[in-house]
Amino acid sequence: MSRRSRGDDLEDLQYQDTDSDVPEPKENRVKVKWTPEEDETLKALVKKHGQGEWKTIASNLNNRTEQQCQHRWLRVLHPDLVKGPWTKEEDEKVIELVKKYGTKHWTLIAKQLRGRMGKQCRERWHNHLNPEVKKSSWTEEEDRIICQAHKVLGNRWAEIAKLLPGRTDNAVKNHWNSTIKRKVETGGFLTVKASGQQEEREDSGYQAAEDQNHVLLSEPVERSANIPEEPSNILSPKLLTKSPGIRSEQESGGEGSNSESATAIVDSAPEKWMVEYVNFLVPGSDIMESDPEAWCELSSFDLGEDSTVSDVGSPTHAAVTDKPQASNVTEYRLDGHTLSDLCKGNKGELIPISPQPQTAFGTPPSVLKQHKKRKITLSPVTENGGSITTSVTEANSMTPKSTPVKSLPFSPSQFLNFWSKQDALELENPSLTSTPVCSQKTMVTTPLHRDKTPLLQKNSVFITPNNKFAADHVLHTPTPFKNALEKFGSLKPLPPTPHLEEDLKEVLRSESGIELIIVDEPKLERQKRKPHSPMKKVRKSLALDIIDKHPKPSSLTLPSAVSAHMQPQTCDSFLSVSLNESSCSREENSVLNQGFVQVKTSKGAVVQLGNTSQLLTDIGELVKTQCSLRNTETATPFKTENGTFTNTDLCPQSLMDLDTFHSTAVASNKCPTIKTETLFQVKPEKTKMQRHNIMNIPEPMTAAWKTVAFGGSQDQMLMQEKARAILNLTYKHSSTSRALVLS
């Protein structure tokens, strides 16, 4: 295909298609596709003004230039323009004009062809009429070149066509779009390698082998007749790599499918083969290409020094065994010591050559060792076409017994000599999953203690055990504690008791002989108070009401004799009362929580009432005290304002009798005033309430408080009757009678 001249490009510019939408660089007019209305208008204007007035025609068309109007008319709308297929007469005319004007004057050629442009004539010549253009079917070699070039160049068909002499860019493009592209996308296209490149690769491989001092011996073709028949399921190296000589004979001798099949077998054969399992060869190019750095040095693969298989299948072994047959080959073996001596010696001396070892167990040189190991993974290569390198039996014997291992950048002894803490612990205290051994003394439930004795000393019987750390687990008592134990004896733990505070108070009383008032200081922190019972809350509110709010308290007046008789025991009795009260107030089962008053009488008739703040004197206790004093003397009549009672049995002996006594008084709406003729009298006096010291006798209760406290009100009496009725029904059959006590 000839090159196009500058004149052809200028000629094509005159007939350029303007249907594209690319804007013009000089003007702002946009190239838009021509519409049918514009085509009709252009035809009318050309018919009116002629083909020379393109400026006037363009002025009548919106957004159209003179060049656009001319190109549209000459290429599309001209009535004499022929767009159909080329006739035989036209082809002959083009061939004749090309011989006359050449391939660079397409404008002159187009003028002599009615209805054809220069571009049409040029394309017709280069694509069809040129005798250099190949019209035969595409070959596999051309397909391979097109595929490889398209991967690099893309859709630059002119440059791809230069690689294929006789093929035009248009033909290459059409062939790619119609055939090759579909095969590549579906994966059915196999890249076929050129035979010339394969031969060149084989020659370069053989030259590299010679540079590395590798000795390759070729066997004559006649020896192939002695090769035993191989199994059908084993791939033979002779089928994988056919020599060029054999391939040329088959191509020249055979015709049709025979030559094509032979070529396909040779061209599609892969370059690298790996030995897998025992007798199978598989392609290993994927493995090597994935990690080329690790596979670059094949000399790092070891198959074992004692393996005789590698010696039998190696090229060195073939050289030794075939030496008598190949008489024209002379081998020389240079030793490393000989080379070192040559460097030290003078020039012109003879080179000592060591004889070839005749024994089959001779050690080949290091260069041949590397070549032997490399030959295991690569297919054998031959120099001339009429020889086969190895037989099937030798190929089978080349199979290694173990898988090749890459060279490691570290030493395995690093892992063998390294022991972690977990490994040492597992060795010293193994899990009991089998029959226990005598040397193992640890139990499963016993906590693990690290034994610092080496493992060698544990298993040895004649080595004295290391008792250096034997005493670490024994607890040592400090010297001051030892002296204290010798002097006072061992400590005895006290039994836990819920009344530890009361026990300490009793110890203090017994040892000191005095009674102390222990007042607990309130803590600054907010303490959680236990919920009080309803009875305790009622009693506390009534007591505070009597002390703080009642405007008319009554005072208790006692004769001097009685007061003098009671003074000596006031302090001691009050201390005991305070101690008992402080202890009882903290107990859940105290006297106040039981709902009745505990009376503790003494020699001086001191009465204590359970309360949390004040000590109040009950009228019932005073009456009881008066009755006890009357027992020592004669019976004195007990006078009231309403009458005189001389019988001592009328004195209330309990709260129940006092309740009955006050009930009769309340019924008559008169509060009695108790008078005594002998010892003392009790009178309600209207005086101001005085704050007495805690050591003085507290003030007596008022009449209103006593009425409510002893259940003298109407609602309380009603509740008492109902309660007694219920109790009588409930405990009707019980032998013991219980009294209801209301406080």
Swiss-Prot record:
Residue numbers of the DNA-binding region are 54-77, 106-129, 157-180
* Region annotation (Disordered) ranges: 1-29, 221-262, 381-406
Tell me the keywords, alphabetical order.
Answer: DNA-binding, Nucleus, Repeat, Transcription, Transcription regulation
* Pfam families, per the entry: Cmyb_C, Myb_DNA-bind_6, Myb_DNA-binding
Identify the coding gene.
Answer: mybl2
Q: Which residues form the HTH myb-type domain?
A: 26-77, 78-133, 134-184
Q: Which GO terms describe its biological process?
A: mitotic cell cycle; positive regulation of transcription by RNA polymerase II
One GO MF annotation is: RNA polymerase II cis-regulatory region sequence-specific DNA binding
Q: Does the keyword Transcription regulation apply?
A: yes
Q: Where along the chain is composition biased (Acidic residues)?
A: 9-22
Report the principal subcellular site. nucleus
Domain of life of the source? Eukaryota
**Subunit text:** Component of the DREAM complex.
Organism this protein belongs to: Xenopus laevis
Query: Gene3D superfamilies in the record, alphabetically?
Result: Homeodomain-like
Q: What is this protein called?
A: Myb-related protein B
Q: Which CDD domains match?
A: SANT
- Any one cellular component term from GO for this entry? nucleus
Localization terms from the record: Nucleus
